[in-house]
């Protein structure tokens, strides 16, 4: 496994400092773990991959810690991919707790790709399966939802659902079985953060004024079988 040039690693660390959180009050840390000098797995768990480097995001306990972790980490993953690095989310990787009550949330393996990879098109739900009232007529709204539609998710569950309205898109998470494990619930919330990162970047590329927030509890939209997560407001 190949080490990354120190100058490039410095750029990566500098980019980490510029990440924009979804919930600023949800404290988190990102550590870069070097493993290019070992052939052993650095983490425990299932579905692991060996890589020269790993990103470990740890967060303090907060109602929106998992959503925020996904939102922040996906910014970093997309940055690394744009620079030619290969990345892989390790949903089951187990890391030791950080200091000061920070708990590991998600691990991402990354490094220089061994060869130019040709990725097969991922299986995704149709856009009409993800919105409450298809079709989506407004072009910008369709592009924003499409950006979320192609986002990665644990076990490709694609838990996101969308309710477009004038000037806003309500974002929902499909409710899963009551037997769902605590970690699986956490991964689903991480997935929602990843999808919202894609939506935010799409809105930015469309030159829209936008913000992500939540409706007041008394005014939360309702979708049977789904849980309200957030709303993306936009102005053209």
Spans of features found by a protein language model:
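Acidic, surface-exposed loops and disordered segments
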Residues: 1-236
């Amino acid at each position: 496994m190949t080490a990354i040039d120190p100058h490039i690693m410095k750029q990566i660390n500098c980019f980490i400092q510029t990440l924009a959180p979804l919930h600023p009050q949800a404290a988190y840390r990102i550590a870069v773990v070097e493993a290019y000098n070992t052939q052993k797995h650095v983490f425990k768990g299932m579905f692991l991959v060996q890589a020269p480097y790993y990103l470990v995001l740890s967060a303090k306990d907060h109602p929106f810690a998992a959503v925020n972790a996904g939102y922040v980490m996906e910014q970093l993953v997309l940055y690394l991919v744009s620079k030619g690095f290969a990345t892989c989310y390790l949903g089951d990787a187990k890391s030791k707790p950080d200091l000061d009550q920070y708990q590991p949330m998600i691990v991402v393996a990354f490094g220089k790709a061994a060869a130019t990879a040709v990725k097969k098109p991922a299986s995704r739900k149709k856009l009409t399966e993800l919105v409450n009232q298809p079709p989506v007529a407004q072009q910008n709204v369709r592009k924003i939802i499409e950006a979320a539609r192609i986002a990665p998710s644990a076990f490709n569950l694609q838990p996101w659902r969308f309710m477009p309205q004038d000037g806003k898109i309500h974002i929902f998470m499909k409710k899963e079985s009551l037997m769902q494990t605590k970690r699986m619930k956490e991964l689903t919330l991480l997935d929602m953060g990843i999808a919202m990162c894609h939506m935010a970047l799409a809105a930015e590329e469309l030159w829209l004024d936008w913000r992500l927030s939540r409706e007041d509890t008394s005014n939360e939209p309702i979708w049977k079988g789904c849980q309200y997560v957030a709303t993306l407001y936009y102005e053209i």
